[in-house]
C-alpha cells in the first residue's frame, strides 16, 4: 500500500502544481488591429468619424420624417419606412424575380435616379434598407423609405450617389 501511495504521490504533486500554475491570472494582452500603430490610429479616426456621421444622419432622417405628412415606422436597422399603397396579399418570395421602380432622391433634395429594373429577391445587390423593405412588402405595394447613409449606399456610394448620402427612396 505504501509503495502504491509513493508512486501516486508525485503525480498528485505534479497535478497540484499544474492546477496552481493554470489558475494564475494571465496578463492582459493589448489588442493591435493591424500590428501597425499608424494604421490602427487611422482606422480608429475613421471609425470615430463614421460614428459621428451616423449620429448626424440619424438626426437628419428623424427630422425629415417628423416634418413629412406621412407616418413612418422605424426599422431596427435604423431606416424609416411607410407603406403608401397596398397591393395584393402575395408576399415576395426568396429567389423571385421582381420588377422594381426605384426613385432615389437626396433627403429633401434633388432626384438622383428614377429607374425600373429586374431584381432577384435575396440576391443582396441592393442596399440594406431596400432589401429589408422588400421583405415587408407584397406584390403591388409601394413604400417610401428614408435611409441614412449606413443603410443606403454607405461610404462608397455609386456613380450617381455620393458617399455618406442620406436618401429618400
Where are the predicted features?
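Cross-family detector of peptidyl-prolyl cis-trans isomerase
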Residues: 6-7, 23-169
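Sec-dependent bacterial lipoprotein signal peptides
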Residues: 1-23
Amino acid at each position: 500500500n505504501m509503495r502504491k501511495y509513493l508512486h501516486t504521490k508525485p503525480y498528485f504533486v505534479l497535478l497540484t502544481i499544474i492546477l496552481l500554475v493554470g489558475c494564475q491570472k494571465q496578463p492582459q494582452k493589448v489588442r493591435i488591429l493591424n500590428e501597425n500603430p499608424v494604421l490602427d490610429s487611422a482606422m480608429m479616426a475613421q471609425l470615430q468619424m463614421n460614428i459621428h456621421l451616423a449620429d448626424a444622419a440619424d438626426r437628419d432622417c428623424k427630422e425629415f420624417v417628423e416634418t413629412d405628412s406621412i407616418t413612418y415606422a422605424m426599422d431596427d436597422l435604423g431606416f424609416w419606412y411607410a407603406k403608401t399603397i397596398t397591393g395584393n396579399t402575395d408576399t415576395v418570395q426568396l429567389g423571385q424575380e421582381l420588377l422594381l421602380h426605384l426613385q432615389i432622391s437626396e433627403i429633401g433634395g434633388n432626384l438622383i435616379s428614377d429607374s425600373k429594373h429586374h431584381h432577384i429577391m435575396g440576391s443582396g445587390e441592393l442596399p440594406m434598407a431596400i432589401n429589408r423593405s422588400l421583405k415587408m412588402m407584397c406584390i403591388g405595394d409601394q413604400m417610401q423609405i428614408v435611409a441614412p447613409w449606413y443603410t443606403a449606399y454607405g461610404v462608397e456610394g455609386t456613380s450617381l450617389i455620393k458617399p455618406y448620402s442620406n436618401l429618400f427612396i
